[in-house]
Amino acid sequence: MNIRIGTRGSVLALAQTLEVTNLLNRYFPEINIQVVKIKTSGDINNKVPINTIGGKGLFIKEIEEALLIGKVDLAVHSVKDIPAFYCDGLIIPCVLKRSSPYDVFVSSKYQSIKSLPINATVGTSSIRRKVQLNYLRPDLQVIPVRGNIDTRILKSDIGEFDGIVLAEAGLIRINKCNVIKEVLDSKIMLSAVGQGAICVQCRADDYNIINKIKVLNCHKSYVCVIAERSFLKTINGSCDTPLAALAQYVDSDTIYMSCMLSNEKEMVFSDCYFKECNAEESGIDMGKKLINELYGSC
C-alpha cells in the first residue's frame, strides 16, 4: 500500500511529518510512504502580518485542496494552524501526543521579559501574544515578525528586536531549545488553541486511511484539542481574534481549561474543571461566557 502525505516544506513542517511517518512505519511496516511538499499561500505571502491576508487558514488551504482532489492521501498540520472551520469532506481523526503547549522568550541580550528595558522591542507574529505582552508590560513595543523559526531568531540576534516570543514545541522539534531564555507561564501567556499538537487530516470517506491513522491517535491530546477547538468555534475565532485556550488533564478523567478573549482594549478570562466526556460542551460554554463578558448578551 502507498500513502502520500501532504505537508508544507518548512523545516518544522517536515519534522512534524517525520513524527507521523515514523509512527506509520512502526505500526504498518508494509506501507510505502511518499512525502509531498506543498507550498501554501501563507508560505508565499511571508512578508506581511498573516491576519491581513486571510488568516491562519492560508497555511493549510492548498494542502486541503490536494487532499480533496486526491493528490495526497493525508495531511499533517499543526493544530494551531487549523481555522475554526475547515473544508467539508475532510476530517481529523488523529492528534499525536502533544508536545509543550507553552510560549518561550528568546533573546541574545536579555534573560526574561521582566528584564527587558523600558520601551524594548519584542517580535511576534501573533495578536494573541501581542495583547498579553501589552497587558504584562504596557511599555513594550510589540512588532510583527514573519518567516520561519531560524529567520525570526536571526532577526533577534542581529538587533531588529530585543527579543522574540515563539512556541516552545517548534523549537523542541527542530532541536533549537538552546536559544530559549524563559518558558512563559500560562498565567502570563496563555497558549494558542491546539499549540504543541500535531494532527492528521484525511478525506471523510477514505475509511482505509481513517482506520490506519486512528491507531496513531493520543486520546488525551485529542480530547484536549476538542475542548479548545470547541471554544474557538464558539468564538468563531481567526488570526485577528485575540484568544487563547489551554486544556490539560489533572487526573485520569478530569480536565482543567483556561481561556482568554480580548478586543485589544480589555481581556477577559475564564477557567473550569470538567470530565472528558463533557469536553466539547465545556468549550462551548466557556466561549459563550467570555463573549457575554466582553461584548454583553446578544
Curated annotation (Swiss-Prot):
Task: For this UniProt record, give its keywords in alphabetical order, as a comma-separated list.
Answer: Porphyrin biosynthesis, Transferase
Cofactor (UniProt): dipyrromethane
Q: What is its EC number?
A: 2.5.1.61
Q: What is this protein called?
A: Porphobilinogen deaminase
What are this entry's molecular-function GO terms?
hydroxymethylbilane synthase activity
The cofactor note from the UniProt entry for this protein is: Binds 1 dipyrromethane group covalently.
Q: Which organism is it from?
A: Ehrlichia canis (strain Jake)
Source organism's superkingdom? Bacteria
Record GO biological process = protoporphyrinogen IX biosynthetic process
| Family statement drawn from the similarity comment of this UniProt entry | Belongs to the HMBS family.
Tell me the name of the encoding gene: hemC
